[in-house]
């Protein structure tokens, strides 16, 4: 190899190494993103719902806190048409998510406090079924945020489905680098989380949750959002066309013992 070729090759290799090191440095500087499990406990109104709430409050949530899940959110439908409970569990890592159930089973205090429910007979189950989805938090909202603990607070849970992985990825980009999350923040629409659904129903999709002081604040914030020039520009950007094929919107209220 001639000296000139050698120097050229060496410079390219060095540049590649620097780029790689730069990427590693950026990754190291970026905040660790949480893994978010969103559960729906299917229950009947009345005694079954009450028993599940007691179990969550007195046994499951304290045990989850001991297992490293620092904050657990528990919610029910504002319109009360369904008795189901929605539970949000943020994990520090995918390994923490995988280990959570084993840690609970090994927790003697959990076994003691929840014995009646954990050992419930088939004729009187604690719940009908659990539906669960696993999400990875967005770059623009890497961790669950708890900024509002007012008794009147209202949560809004929204899921955006896409007809392809490529369009789903583009919608996530619209939130992150496109500025939609930043727009929410500017307009006082406080995020709880934004997550890309990795496993669950109706994928590909993303799901996010916002919190408002009350229903009046919810309506006023969305009115501001729809009229904002930045949103008008963003929604008409052709690169984000046809990124959403279906939207699910649910208004929730927190349980008295919810940590979110």
Task: Annotate each PLM feature.
Residues 3-4, 39, 158:
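Short, cationic motifs built from Arg/Lys/His that form the positively charged side of catalytic pockets
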Residues 8-9, 29-32, 50, 160:
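Anionic, Ser/Thr-rich low-complexity intrinsically disordered regions
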Residues 31-34, 180, 184, 200-260:
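C-terminal functional regions that serve as terminal interaction/effector modules
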Residues 41-52, 58-66, 70-147, 162-164, ...:
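Hydrophobic, ordered structural segments
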């Amino acid at each position: 190899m001639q000296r000139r070729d050698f120097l050229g090759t060496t410079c390219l290799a060095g540049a590649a190494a620097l780029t790689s090191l730069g990427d590693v440095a950026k990754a190291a500087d970026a905040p660790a993103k949480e893994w978010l499990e969103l559960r729906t406990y299917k229950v009947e109104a009345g005694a079954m719902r009450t028993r599940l709430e007691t179990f969550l409050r007195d046994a499951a949530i304290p045990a989850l806190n001991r297992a490293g899940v620092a904050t657990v959110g528990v919610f029910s439908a504002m319109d009360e048409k369904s008795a189901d409970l929605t539970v949000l569990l943020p994990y520090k890592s995918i390994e923490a998510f995988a280990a959570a159930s084993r840690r609970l089973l090994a927790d003697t205090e959990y076994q003691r406090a929840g014995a009646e429910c954990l050992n419930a007979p088939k004729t009187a189950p604690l719940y009908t079924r659990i539906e669960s989805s696993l999400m990875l938090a967005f770059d623009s909202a890497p961790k669950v945020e708890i900024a509002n603990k007012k008794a009147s607070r209202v949560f809004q849970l929204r899921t955006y489905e896409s007809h392809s992985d490529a369009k789903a990825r583009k919608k996530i980009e619209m939130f992150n680098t496109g500025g939609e999350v930043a727009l929410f923040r500017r307009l006082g629409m406080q995020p709880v989380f934004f997550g890309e659904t990795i496993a669950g129903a109706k994928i590909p999709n993303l799901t996010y949750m916002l919190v408002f002081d009350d229903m009046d604040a919810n309506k006023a914030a969305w009115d501001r959002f729809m009229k904002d020039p930045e949103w008008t520009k963003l929604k008409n950007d052709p690169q984000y066309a046809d990124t959403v094929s279906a939207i699910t919107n649910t208004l929730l209220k927190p349980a008295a013992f919810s940590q979110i």
